[in-house]
């Protein structure tokens, strides 16, 4: 988790710098901006890695909180399994969106 945490920090700070601090800031972010940005495999990979690492980091944090505060083994297992299922579902949906995003299928949006 330490290495992924460091990588997550680099990705998140890079995201904040590029998306919110450079240029005119967050006002420029719209569908067209994302479409142009995601035309590059570099930015798709960057955003996908940011999403995956954030989800893994968050799910691991929930697991640690559950292990610390939930005493009943059955409830602990239920909460952890629910967290894993939700996290996996979000990972699959996020991957589908990043991989299949095509602005040409949104007429009039760009």
Feature-to-residue mapping (PLM):
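Membrane-embedded alpha-helical bundles that constitute the cytochrome b-like, heme-associated redox core
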Residues: 1-110
């Amino acid at each position: 988790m330490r290495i992924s945490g460091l990588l997550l920090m680099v990705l998140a700070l890079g995201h904040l710098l590029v998306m919110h601090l450079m240029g005119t800031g967050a006002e420029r972010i719209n569908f067209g901006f994302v479409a142009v940005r995601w035309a590059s495999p570099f930015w798709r990979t960057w955003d996908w890695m940011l999403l995956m690492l954030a989800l893994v980091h968050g799910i691991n944090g929930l697991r640690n909180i559950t292990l610390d505060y939930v005493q009943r083994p059955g409830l602990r297992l239920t909460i952890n399994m629910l967290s894993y299922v939700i996290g996996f579902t979000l990972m699959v949906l996020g991957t589908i969106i990043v991989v299949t995003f095509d602005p040409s299928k949104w007429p009039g949006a760009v």
